[in-house]
Regions:
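Compositionally biased linear targeting/interaction segments
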Residues: 1-368
Length: 368
């Protein structure tokens, strides 16, 4: 009877955790509808609770990112901005090849995977290369539908896609900093080396002035994937830029990939942003942060608004049992928030860091 009793407790706690995750998602929707000052603002942890959200006998957390993520050993809690990433459905080769862990050949293969033709980009891969695989399959020749689809692109490796962050929680877990003792293979340098997955999206989309004037109804009923109609015109009527990045939330790694940027300029922007957490609205502060004419080239690719978010929810039920994790991508460009993608993250294991794990495993300190 003892094991049946324990199993029943786990099942009940798991159901509690699942409902807590559902409740936390509804809480996020409520915040979007009632707490944001302006449409397109980022819902920071200053206006909503993102950790230890008590829902009945369960507790939920929203796993986020911070500017210091590469050295953190416990998670940062918050919402993940999809507009802080590079859109792999629209970014040109020159941007893609600058992403960490990526090779020029893989960047070219991404272009060939998503374009409509069978013409091989220099060093890329079209149908012939895929037909020569041990288990042959076709080249899609259509936009990405998920970022995980990168696994299918010719030349992809697990290390390239995930880096050391195999559970995708954005922090350096013990098994990601122990060399060859436990998976994944890592260099035990005390720093989390991300793969490409951390820095890319297919969902980011900032509406054009024409779309804004048409209203949310036409945008919500268009049926288009957000990442497939993402373009803005450069000031002065120049060429359209294929995507934009939220300079208020993007990492230095992402910013360094943009035209006119490099690692030094990108780090200056992030450092200024961290030192001035409430900068003036718009992009004027970027020119204040960086005294360089090069940054002017990047301005058309920058925005301070966002409408697509990832809500990475982890919860436990009563007595610290029944751990559940699920990730949602939410689009807020219509009249009401819409879930674009849901992914069960349970199989990636514990994502709340060693401190919370110790509390959960210590009855006297268990999170309730």
């Amino acid at each position: 009877m003892f094991f049946e009793y324990k199993g029943a407790n786990q099942s009940i706690a798991g159901a509690q955790a699942e409902q807590a995750n559902n409740g936390a998602l509804r809480y996020f929707f409520h915040t979007l509808n009632n707490a944001l000052e302006e449409e397109g603002d980022f819902p920071s942890e200053l206006i909503m609770q993102t950790e230890q959200i008590q829902i009945g006998q369960a507790t939920a957390w929203m796993l986020g990112r911070s500017g210091e993520t590469v050295t953190l050993t416990d998670p940062h809690f918050g919402v993940i901005d999809e507009c802080a990433k590079i859109n792999i459905n629209t970014a040109p080769f020159e941007v893609l090849e600058l992403l960490p862990t990526i090779t020029p050949e893989f960047a070219a293969a991404i272009i060939d995977w998503r374009d409509e033709d069978d013409d091989v980009t220099e060093n890329g891969a079209e149908a012939t290369m895929y037909s020569l695989q041990t288990l042959p399959y076709g080249c899609k020749n259509a936009p990405f539908e998920t970022v995980e689809e990168l696994r299918l692109v010719y030349g992809a490796t697990v290390e390239m896609i995930y880096g050391e962050d195999t559970n995708q929680n954005g922090v350096l877990d013990p098994n990601e900093n122990d060399g060859m003792q436990t998976p994944p293979l890592d260099n035990q340098d005390g720093t989390l080396n991300f793969g490409i997955l951390e820095h890319v999206t297919i969902y980011s989309k900032i509406p054009t002035e024409e779309e804004e004037s048409e209203g949310a109804d036409s945008d919500n009923n268009s049926g288009d994937q957000p990442g497939n109609r993402n373009s803005q015109q450069e000031p002065g009527g120049g060429d359209e830029v294929p995507f934009q990045v939220n300079v208020s939330t993007a990492s230095a790694i992402v910013l360094a990939c943009l035209p006119g940027m490099d690692e030094a300029i990108a780090q200056q922007i992030v450092s200024y942003r961290l030192a001035n957490p409430d900068p003036t609205e718009g992009l004027e502060w970027v020119s204040e942060a960086v005294d360089s004419e090069d940054v002017q080239q990047a301005l058309p690719y920058l925005t301070d608004k966002t409408q697509q978010f990832t809500i990475d929810l982890a919860a436990i039920g009563s007595n610290g049992n029944g751990y559940r994790r699920v990730r949602y991508v939410v689009d807020t460009s219509g009249e009401a928030p819409v879930v674009l993608h849901r992914r069960d993250m349970q199989r990636f294991g514990w994502a709340l860091g060693p401190t919370l794990l110790e509390q959960v495993n210590t009855p006297s300190q268990a999170v309730r």
